A protein has these predicted regions:
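Metal- or metallocofactor-binding catalytic centers and their adjacent structured scaffolds
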Residues: 216-252, 426-429, 437-439, 548
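A conserved hydrophobic secondary-structure block that centers on an alpha-helix together
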Residues: 258-260, 264-271
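Short acidic, hydrophobic short linear motifs in intrinsically disordered regions
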Residues: 236-240, 247-261, 286-290, 445-457, ...
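Basic, low-complexity terminal or inter-domain segments flanking catalytic cores
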Residues: 3-5, 16, 150, 160, ...
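C-terminal or mid-to-C-terminal helical accessory/interaction module adjacent to the motor/catalytic core
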Residues: 112-196, 238-245
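Intrinsically disordered, low-complexity regulatory segments
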Residues: 1-139, 148, 408
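Short, polar/flexible loop-turn hinges at active-site or ligand-entry regions and domain interfaces
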Residues: 52, 80-82, 99-105, 124-132, ...
């Protein structure tokens, strides 16, 4: 007879864990939740707000097998993930399998490795009902909002629409950004750049590329400045050298992994999570839903050893980072490789690429700062007060840059063609003008969200948690309120006026502007639903309210608030608003516009909104 039954939520995780335990352990999978709310009913008691859970039909046979094995076992170990969702899965198992909460062992671990699993078996705990209740609060609140808002949309906007608490706020961000872009008026300005020559000690000449410290708002002013430069002499007013240190980025959290995998690998948010899940379940990385940047002392030690072996002692600089995001759980760890000695892995191309990114980010976080010398050269003329500035950087010691450099959404826009290595140069050096040019540029408006930048914004506002970012972004696209696509740019003329010798030559060019790829765009129906919810349910759509709800979930998880009290308070305010909007009379649905009167029938004629425009 088996003595121990271990239940996890995924078959891949079960397979990995089974390798680490003896013959007296059997590992089974629950395949996620074995109980949930009914799909087509509210399934929440109107008076008590208690949820009525059911076992879905497709889980009945599995539950039967789990019950049979639980009866045979001397001990049952519930080993679902260490977050609130995982705790709820364990609680549902406890309830459905008729397990005694006091004698059932709950085990948690950050990674699926033999030492971690054995340590968890040595240190079991009881179910944490605070975590379970925080999950129940989220599930019930989201069901109430979705179930009660959707019929309002059916009646007032269009049948078959749906709304969700976090998803609707995410759509609001995208709609508002689109409107900012439409309202933005780009203004021209003129940037002045110069290329000077300096004579070196051996008689050869080197180029010094510079930019003027002033921009002009009119073409006439820019040309007038070029005229002043015709008979101007130029010399170096001063040279400043400044040592800079660059720190490595902290190890990955869920959101930073999603953002960096999008920028560096081109992965969607959901793709990143699917690949990370496979790496975790194979025992290759730690748990992938986390908002902590902490590393275990074991990992810090292993990283130090690996860095010294691969790059040398001077590259090692062990450090721990501290988490600053709202609601972060310091007990958890950042996303890191389980074994730093594994610099690469076998697997699919996606798995190898994501693992490589995680390994490099973790290693870099434990490496020395990059030491850089920044040189700024001020170039003056007796003809005017403005200065030309040349910037140069020399990497004195590459440190963590040897392995990894963090990217940003603005990388492409911030590339400076006039930042370069400078030749030997000192105060008083006389420079020869080669060319000075005025380039017409335009002020840049806001850019549309990518999946990665939307995750960053949600995290910044305190909306959602590591487990909700990917589902939120998937849901708003599945509902077709938002589409991921490309925005075709427009051709825009601009002029470059170049002074060479005593002649100013204009060159007219055309550039493509506003061309965006893989951006989140609101659909027409997404805009209509957003505007309807903003007008009628401003509290639900408020960013601060949504962030406050997340904080209340955290309070419940910490045992500082009763989840049923939170639900009752919310429903008491929400229900009357729903009733008021539902019963309000209106001549036509949201998103419809009256075109005129039908001359035959005398009835008004409306244009209706479809998903992608008027119909």
């Amino acid at each position: 007879m088996q003595e121990n039954l271990v239940i996890v939520e995924s078959p891949a995780k079960a397979k990995t864990i089974e390798k680490f335990l003896g013959d007296d352990f059997k590992v089974m999978s629950s395949y996620g939740h074995i109980r949930d709310l009914k799909k087509k009913e509210l399934s929440i008691d109107k008076e008590t707000l208690q949820p009525a859970y059911v076992i879905p039909k497709d889980k009945e046979e599995l539950v039967k097998r789990l019950r049979e094995n639980a009866k045979k076992a001397d001990k049952v170990w519930l080993a679902s993930d260490e977050d609130r969702e995982g705790e709820a899965i364990s609680w549902h198992l406890c309830e459905v399998l008729g397990l005694d909460e006091a004698s059932t062992n709950r085990i948690v671990f950050h990674e699926i490795t033999k030492p971690a699993i054995l340590a968890a078996i040595e240190n079991p705990r009881h179910l944490d009902m605070n975590l379970v209740n925080a999950q129940q609060a989220r599930r019930v609140l989201d069901r109430i909002v979705g179930f009660k808002l959707s019929p309002v949309l059916w009646r007032k906007v269009k049948p078959a629409l749906s709304a969700g608490r976090v998803q609707s706020v995410a759509v609001r961000l995208i709609v508002e950004r689109e409107r900012e872009i439409q309202q933005f008026k780009s203004e021209p300005y003129y940037r002045i750049n110069a290329i000077f020559a300096i004579t070196n000690a051996d008689g050869s000449q080197s180029e010094v590329k510079t930019e003027l410290d002033k921009r002009f708002t009119t073409h006439d002013d820019a040309i007038a400045f070029l005229e002043k430069c015709k008979d101007a002499e130029f010399s170096v007013a001063n040279v400043t050298k400044k040592p800079l240190k660059r720190m490595p980025a902290p190890p990955f959290t869920t959101s930073t992994l999603q953002q960096e995998a999008a920028r560096k690998l081109g992965f969607s948010v959901s793709q990143t999570m699917m690949v990370a899940q496979r790496l975790y379940e194979s025992g290759l990385i730690t748990y992938m839903r986390t908002d902590s940047v902490n590393l275990s002392s074991l990992c810090i030690g292993a990283a130090k050893e690996e860095i010294i072996k691969l790059y040398g002692e001077e590259y090692s600089s062990p450090r721990n980072f501290h988490t600053h995001s709202k609601g972060a759980q310091e007990a958890h760890e950042a996303i890191r490789p389980t074994y730093m000695a594994n610099t690469s892995i076998e697997g699919t191309a996606q798995e190898r690429r994501l693992y490589d990114l995680i390994w490099k980010r973790t290693a870099a976080s434990q490496m020395a700062e990059a030491q850089i010398e920044k040189t700024t050269v001020n170039i003056a003329s007796s003809k005017f007060d403005e200065r030309f500035i040349a910037n140069g950087e020399v990497v004195k010691f590459d440190g963590f840059i040897k392995v990894y450099r963090e990217s940003t959404d603005e990388d492409a826009e911030q590339q400076d063609e006039f930042a370069h290595n400078l030749p030997p140069i000192k105060e008083g050096d006389v420079l020869t003008r080669r060319e000075i040019s005025s380039t017409e540029r335009y002020s840049q408006g806001p850019t549309r969200y990518t999946e990665a930048s939307l995750v960053h914004k949600l995290e910044e506002l305190g909306i959602g948690r590591p487990s909700t970012y990917a589902p939120t972004i998937s849901t708003i696209q599945q509902r077709e309120y938002v589409v991921k696509g490309d925005k075709k740019g427009e051709e825009r003329p601009y002029v470059i006026d170049t002074l060479r010798g005593l002649k100013i030559t204009p060159t007219r060019k055309v550039e493509l502007t506003g061309n965006e790829k893989g951006k989140l765009l609101p659909t027409d129906i997404g805009i209509v639903v957003n505007d309807f919810l903003m007008e009628n349910f401003p509290a639900i759509m408020d960013y601060n309210f949504t962030a406050k709800v997340e904080q209340q979930f955290d309070q419940i998880a910490d045992g500082k608030e009763e989840w049923t009290d939170m639900m009752k308070h919310f429903d008491q305010e929400f229900e009357p608003t729903v009733d008021k909007v539902m019963n309000a009379r209106s001549e036509h649905k949201a998103g419809e516009r009256q075109l005129g009167i039908d001359p035959v029938s005398g009835h008004p004629v409306f244009v209706k909104i479809g998903r992608y425009g008027p119909v």
